[in-house]
């Protein structure tokens, strides 16, 4: 039967896709999400500019399930221009400015790359010792390792565009004034909240999801109550259970000497998370 066969589903690497066709395993490969992350993927592939392709992180953040069902516009965590291509055209500057970006997380890195590629003189200050910010914690969670590719790609683009980095550099009013930039972008991220407003919370040892994901704290035994039932909370619960029994499939509940309970105000866990990610996590 002479029926063309196409394959689809999480094939993010164009070289792998080409290999499937060249070996005669399929007649073609359909790529959806990778073209949201980088609409110029086919053009870059034809020009052998594989390092310039922005990789899809397979996060399923807003490309599968729209955030607002009343305005079902597809979005992309990696490419914020999706749906706004004509709102923010790429225009190289004819008046380069000295730009200081405080913070080397995903937001700071993307801003740095965008400004530098437009021709500005960009410097990034990061109080830590590496780029990535909270993305370094996100990729620790099971199934999120592909997000590392985006961070590696941002670093590649930043270096190619001439972005300068200073690590272990904390911004103050004084040293920012001394640096004398034309523009300052604050991209310092967020800090986890300790709910001191909850009566009696001070009677128990309280940690944050960051403490668990960063391995700053491990919980080999005991009873754990996680306040919140969003994606990060569920991933944290899974990691605690996985640590309790490393060689087993971890689910929330009780394993050995560890018992985890999630407390959520919404009627269900992981409200607003795309259905495939939610089903896998739960």
Language model region names:
Residues 16, 41, 111, 154, ...:
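Residues within well-ordered alpha-helices
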Residues 133-179, 273-282:
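N-terminal Rossmann-like dinucleotide/flavin-binding domain of flavoprotein oxidoreductases
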Residues 6-10, 31-34, 165-168, 229, ...:
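Glycine- and other small-residue-rich loops at beta-strand/loop junctions that grip anionic moieties
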Residues 89-91, 96, 137-149, 209-216, ...:
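Short, contiguous acidic/charged loop-to-helix segments that flank catalytic cores in large enzymes
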Residues 26, 181-182:
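Local beta-strand N-terminus motif with an aromatic residue
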Residues 1-102, 106, 110-117, 121-122, ...:
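Flavin-dependent oxidoreductase catalytic cores
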Residues 21, 96-127, 166-180, 188-197, ...:
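Rossmann-like dinucleotide/flavin-binding elements
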């Amino acid at each position: 039967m002479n029926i063309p066969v196409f394959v689809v589903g999480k094939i993010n690497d164009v070289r792998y896709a080409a290999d499937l066709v060249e070996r005669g395993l399929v007649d073609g490969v359909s790529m959806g999400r990778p073209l949201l992350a980088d609409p110029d993927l086919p053009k870059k592939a034809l020009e052998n500019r594989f390092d310039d392709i922005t990789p899809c992180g397979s996060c399923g953040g807003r490309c599968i399930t729209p955030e607002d069902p009343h305005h079902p516009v597809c979005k992309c965590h990696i490419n914020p221009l999706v749906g706004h291509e004509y709102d923010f055209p790429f225009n190289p500057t004819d008046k380069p400015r000295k730009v200081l970006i405080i913070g080397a997380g995903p937001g700071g890195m993307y801003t740095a790359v965008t400004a530098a590629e437009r021709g500005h003189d960009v410097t990034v200050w990061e109080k830590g010792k590496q780029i990535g910010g909270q993305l370094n914690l996100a990729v620790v969670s099971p199934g999120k390792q592909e997000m590392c590719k985006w961070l590696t790609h941002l670093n590649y683009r930043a270096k190619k565009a001439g972005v300068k980095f200073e690590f272990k550099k904390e911004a103050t009013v004084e040293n920012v004034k001394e640096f004398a930039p034309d523009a300052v972008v604050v991209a310092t991220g967020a800090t986890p909240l300790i709910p001191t407003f909850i009566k009696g919370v001070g009677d128990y040892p309280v940690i944050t999801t960051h403490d668990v994901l960063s391995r700053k704290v491990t919980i080999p035994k005991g009873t754990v109550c996680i306040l919140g039932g969003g994606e990060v909370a569920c991933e944290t619960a899974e990691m605690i259970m996985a640590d309790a029994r490393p060689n087993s499939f971890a689910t929330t509940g009780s394993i050995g000497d560890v018992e985890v309970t999630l407390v959520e105000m919404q009627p269900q866990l992981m409200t607003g998370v795309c259905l495939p990610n939610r089903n896998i996590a739960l």
